[in-house]
Each structure stands twice: as C-alpha cells, then as structure tokens.
Amino acid sequence: MRVLKFGGTSVANAERFLRVADIMESNARQGQVATVLSAPAKITNHLVAMIDKTVAGQDILPNMSDAERIFADLLSGLAQALPGFEYDRLKGVVDQEFAQLKQVLHGVSLLGQCPDSVNAAIICRGEKLSIAIMEGVFRAKGYPVTVINPVEKLLAQGHYLESTVDIAESTLRIAAAAIPADHIVLMAGFTAGNDKGELVVLGRNGSDYSAAVLAACLRADCCEIWTDVDGVYTCDPRTVPDARLLKSMSYQEAMELSYFGAKVLHPRTITPIAQFQIPCLIKNTSNPQAPGTLIGKDSTDADMPVKGITNLNNMAMINVSGPGMKGMVGMAARVFAVMSRAGISVVLITQSSSEYSISFCVPQGELQRARRALEEEFYLELKDGVLDPLDVMERLAIISVVGDGMRTLRGISARFFSALARANINIVAIAQGSSERSISVVVSNDSATTGVRVSHQMLFNTDQVIEVFVIGVGGVGGALIEQIYRQQPWLKQKHIDLRVCGIANSRVMLTNVHGIALDSWRDALAGAQEPFNLGRLIRLVKEYHLLNPVIVDCTSSQAVADQYVDFLADGFHVVTPNKKANTSSMNYYQQLRAAAAGSHRKFLYDTNVGAGLPVIENLQNLLNAGDELVRFSGILSGSLSFIFGKLDEGLSLSAATLQARANGYTEPDPRDDLSGMDVARKLLILAREAGYKLELSDIEVEPVLPPSFDASGDVDTFLARLPELDKEFARNVANAAEQGKVLRYVGLIDEGRCKVRIEAVDGNDPLYKVKNGENALAFYSRYYQPLPLVLRGYGAGNDVTAAGVFADLLRTLSWKLGV
C-alpha cells in the first residue's frame, strides 16, 4: 500500500487533475494506492475570505464567483477530455455544495460572527469536492473506488480548527471498513471528526498531515507527498538560485528544517511517519520522472553533513533579566507557563550561563500580547527591581543550519559564523539543541536573505560569486572586461561565477545583477541611458543582496577615489590601479584600512605599483613575516625606463621622448611623465606600506627636466623646445659611461627619506640593465641583504595592468577558495 497526497496546485485545473489521475493509475498497477487530495489552488483562500468578509459585512460576490468558476472550468475541462465522465451528476454535487455554502454564510451574516465549528465546515469544502470529482474520474476510467469519510474514520482531539488525530483509534475504524484490495482509495485532506462526530479540521498544512496519518493507519509502505517542486532543497531556491536538491534526509533532519521555516513539510506531518518508520517521498507532479527526496530513518547523503539552511522572518526577542533571576528556582518555568497560557508559541530560547537572563523569540505579531502577559505575571518583581524592565528587540529573523552530520564533523559552526561575519551580519543570539543536529542564530530581518545566501555558499561549496562593477572603460578597464570574457571557461572549471554586473564611464552606466553579456558590452554601453551614479551601485547591492560585490576603479579620478571608504562600508571590495586614494592624505589612507577591516572587505591595489608585477603583495608578505625594509631602489616608470634606455643606445632626449610617446609609453603630454610625480606617487605607496607615515609633499622629487628649462606652452611647443636639452643629457650620459655607469630615473627609500632623481648606476646594480619599458624594484631588507629581492618585468601597458587587476579580483575569494 502506498499513500499519495496531491496539493492544491496539482489539482488546480482539468489538465493537472488528469495528470494526477495518471500518476495514481501508474502507481496502482504496482500495488494498492490510497490518495489524499487538497482543494484546488485558491479555493481555500476564497472560502476564508468569504467568512471574513461576511462577518465584516462586505461583499463576497467576487470570491464566490471566482470559486464557482474554478470548479465550472474544472468540470467542463474533464468532460471534454474524458469519455464517460459524469458531468451532469458532478455539476449537481458542486452546485449543491455552493447552495449550502451560501445558506451557511447567510446565517453567519445574521449572527455577525462565525463560530469555529461553522468555520471548519466551510473551509474544508474544497477538499470534499476534489474527492468527489476524482471519484468521478476513476469511475469513468472503469476503476472501483472506495472513499474514506475522514469525519467518520479519523478521530481527532483538540480545537475545531487545529485538531490532532488519534492514530490508534483511527486505525481500528479504517480497518473495520474492510476496503477491497483492488479498489482505488480516496480521502479528503484537512478534515477529521471529534468524539461527538462533529467535523474538525487539522490546521495549517492539514492535508499533508492527513496523508501522514492515513499512511500510519494503513501501515503503508510509503507516503508520497506530490507538490510543485522536485523535492526538498538545501535552501529555498527563490532565495538561493543554486540550491541543491537533496536525495534523502532523516526524519529528525526534516523535523528540524520544517520547524525552522522550510515550506515543504509541516512538523506535524513528520511525527506519524517517523513514529511508524514509514518512508516519505517528496515528488513533483509536473516532473514525475525526477527522483524526489526520500525522508526516512537514515539519510544516504553521507557526504552532506549539513542538509539545509532555513530562515524564519518577522520574529521578536524578549529578554527577561535582573538580579533576582540568579538562583531563583522556577523562574524559567513561570516565564514559559505565561506564554503557554497566552497561547503564544516560543520559537527559540537562550539563557546566559550566569542565570542572569533568559531570552526567547516569538512571532512579531504576538509580541504585544507576550509583553503584556509577562508584565502582568511579574508585576511585583518588576516594581521592586528584582527584574529589570523587559528588553525587546523587534524585526529579527532566525537562520538555522540543520544536518545529522553536524554531530560528528568539526568546524560547521565556525564556517557558519565566519560566513555571517564576512557578510557583516551581526549575530544577536545563538541557540543549539543538545542533539547537535541544528544550530540557529538570530539576526536582523534585513540581513536574513544575505545571511542565508552567504551561509549556503560557505557550507555547500557551490560556485563562488564575484559581482564586478567596472568604473572606467578606457585602456585598462576595457582590457579587463575582455580578459574576464575570455577566461569564462577557466572560471567555470574552477567553480567561480565571475559576473560583470555594472560597467560605467564618466557619463552613463550599464547594470544587470545577473551579469552583462560581455560579447556585446561596448554596444550596450553606447546605448545606455542611465546616468552614472555611484549611489545607485550601493543601492543595487542592498536591494539584491549581492554576496561578493567588487568595485573596480580603472579611472584616474580623485572623486571616485574619495568614495572608497563609503564603498567598503557598504559591503564592496575595492580593487583599483588608481593611485589617487593611496597617495591622498595620511588620514584618508588610514581611514581606508580601518573601513576595510571594519567591514571585512578587501582593498586591493597591487597594480598601483608595477602594473601586473606582484609588488605590493610580495612586500606585504615580507613585512607580515617579520621582515623590515632597510633600503629600496627602483625604476617605477615604464615610460622613463624606455627613455633612459634609449639614451644608453645613443638617442637624444628629445628623440627618445618622441619615440616613447609614439609607442604609447607616455601620457599624451610627456611632461606628466618627465615631472617625476607619477614615480613619486608610487614611491609614497611603497613607503607607506613599509610603515612610514609620509605625505606626498615629503617626497624629494628631482624632475627629469632641469628647473632652468622653460617647459611652458602647449604640447607641440614643449616638444619643439625639448632638443635644447639634448646636449646636456648627452654629456651626462657620456660622463656616466666613462665610469662604467648608466643613467636611470630612480625612486629611493633610505632611512625614512624618499627621493626621486636621476642616478648613475654601475654594472653591479640590479637597475643597470633595466630598459625598454621594464620596471625593476630592489628591496633590501633584514632578510634580503646584501643581495636584494628584485622584481622585474613590464610595469606598464593595458593588458599587464588588467591582468594584475584580474588577479586582485580573484583574491576577494581568498577567504573561501585557495585561488
């Protein structure tokens, strides 16, 4: 015997009704089947609305008409599709039910209220009609059918609207019916009868509970819950799109997940099947070939110690505390007895080890009743100061991680808390059951979605996300986007979902949180209408709960650099080749580091010095290992490396400068390079990394051009005048050559002083052979002397700089992946 249950969406129309019948028929070929049906989708909601509107004296006609139309369409669709379907008889059954419903509602209107017994009789009519219609379908197919009347066969105790079935007595009643083995068995869900023979209903998710009870009474081989999803997922797929379908889970895991908010099954449904060790299979009516999720005594997913993450929103926390709590026997019992008498469900409890306080969560809607009840119960204690005034926190959510394997595997809690910390989510309270099967945290309501997503990513090792917003799409920015596009196959292989969610130039921006199509981004940006707005990017992160957003600033803008602290505080990592932020005031420099540390975000700028060379990272690694910078010398400008290299080869200063400009090494105005300020900025960054608290004005800069030279006018005028310096530079080059040296434009750090100047270096110096646009950096430290640590390579160019930015992007994942 198998018990099947189909929910409201599964019987919403004629097509789905017949699909359910086909599933039942297929199962019946393998053995006897008993089926529990819900009301067609929306019917119960209409019935509840009719009760509420009738009591309030409002018009119920729209709800009544919609409900009648749903059944009319259902019957006509079945009549057209199924030969032999008794349309006229069943239409009469439906019409009679609605006629009775109208009479009952008229009585409610006269009374001005709806007694619970009447309410129960009204809201279960949809299930009753579903069974009548399904019986008609199988009689048309030629099957013998037995309909179990749940009011007669299921004995329930409790309230009219929330009863619990006595399985032992109900088993005897159903057995007495002696159902033939070849019959299709049908029973309306949600409904039972009390010891007076009155109709009662089984509360929320009552049809699932009905199916579990029937399976227990029949000692079924399996209870199948057919719904509109493929099974139980590790998380709500609407919150986490890459949630994984579970093959199996234990009764205890299912109970914990459902208690803490999973929507597939209600905790009451699990109790009967767990008591009688009946496997429960969750299946999709629209996708019957999917394997579904099997709930049983043990889980077969041994490789998944955590089975799911859930959240309960709209909670409030009440803290009862005070000096009188410590050592006072029975205080906790009084607190929860008050909640019980008030009919308020306590969802989560924590108590301090000092016994000074006890905290618990209740639904937000129950908060005021809970507070009043506690204040009445503890009036004297509050008045005398034995208890402190009740402390209440509102708009909270509970995030729970559930899995049998948590008992034996170390580190689950650490990873859970680490994920929340990385997302800047503050934990209000923590609770763990003695079974170690679940751990729950209380957070703010606004943080719940982000908390669930980041926890799922950490615990289930799904694709790691980087959501990139590129500002500035000139040389480096454009090259970066092209590299990201080309590297997508490699990224997918590494399970990295790197999506470009925003592209902006100085005028407009293009955004798509699901990822911009990178094969046509230039055309899309050209047609973009949305003005560039940094505030809009911040709002996107909060609105869509992005997990790992990264601002990539590929501009040279001071205005954008001034926003980095705000970006970090709002949850972005910041990756940039823009040197403006790191060479602003020392105060802003320190604010950036504090903002990054305080928000658990990364500020990465390895391309500030040396473009794609790993300069900053290597220097930081040295210093973190306890090394100390003693001295530094380096060629930090690709353009000046090229120019001074050409001087060695006999070119004049003016010719070398023109050639460097033609090859794209210099800025459009070469005076920007020849001033030495770009080198000074890079040197300041290195000095600050080494721990020196310096400003840009502290750098001693000797420009390439002597002070006596008139460098005024436009670019063409300047370049026309530049040959005036050729003889002087040729003489300096010759003098250096006589000593076996060459001229290099060098940045120096020595004893806390920073200098930028032309230096003559000999063949033993690591800078001697550096030319053609290369950078070279020589770090003399306590560990590296007398021979320095030398980094050498091309330190300019869009592609190498973009590659360095790409590497920094991947470092935003370093807390989760070894990349």
Curated annotation (Swiss-Prot):
Record region (Interface): 250-470
Pathway the protein takes part in: Amino-acid biosynthesis; L-lysine biosynthesis via DAP pathway; (S)-tetrahydrodipicolinate from L-aspartate: step 1/4; Amino-acid biosynthesis; L-methionine biosynthesis via de novo pathway; L-homoserine from L-aspartate: step 1/3; Amino-acid biosynthesis; L-methionine biosynthesis via de novo pathway; L-homoserine from L-aspartate: step 3/3; Amino-acid biosynthesis; L-threonine biosynthesis; L-threonine from L-aspartate: step 1/5
Annotated phenotype, changing S352F: In strain: Sr41 / TLr156; loss of feedback inhibition
Keyword Ligase: no
Biological process terms in GO annotation: homoserine biosynthetic process; lysine biosynthetic process via diaminopimelate; methionine biosynthetic process; threonine biosynthetic process
UniProt binding sites for NAD(+): V473, G475, V476, A504, T555, G797
Residues binding Na(+), per UniProt: D606, V609, A611, L613
Residues annotated for L-homoserine binding in this entry: E667, D678
Outcome (variant: G330D): In strain: Sr41 / 8000, Sr41 / HNr21; loss of feedback inhibition
Pfam families membership: AA_kinase, ACT_9, Homoserine_dh, NAD_binding_3
Active-site residues from the entry: K682
Cofactor comment text: A sodium ion is seen in the structure; a metal ion may subtly affect the relative position of the nucleotide-binding region to influence enzyme activity, and could increase the stability of the enzyme.
EC number of this enzyme: 2.7.2.4, 1.1.1.3
Record region (Aspartokinase): 1-249
Stored CDD domains: AAK_AK-HSDH (cd04257), ACT_AKi-HSDH-ThrA-like_1 (cd04921), ACT_AKi-HSDH-ThrA_2 (cd04922)
Binding site for NADP(+): V476, R507, T555, K579, G664, E667, G797
MF GO annotations: aspartate kinase activity; ATP binding; homoserine dehydrogenase activity; metal ion binding; NAD+ binding; NADP binding
Annotated NADPH binding sites: V476, T555, S556, K579, G797
Chain's role: Bifunctional aspartate kinase and homoserine dehydrogenase that catalyzes the first and the third steps toward the synthesis of lysine, methionine and threonine from aspartate.
Name assigned to this protein: Bifunctional aspartokinase/homoserine dehydrogenase 1
Protein's organism: Serratia marcescens
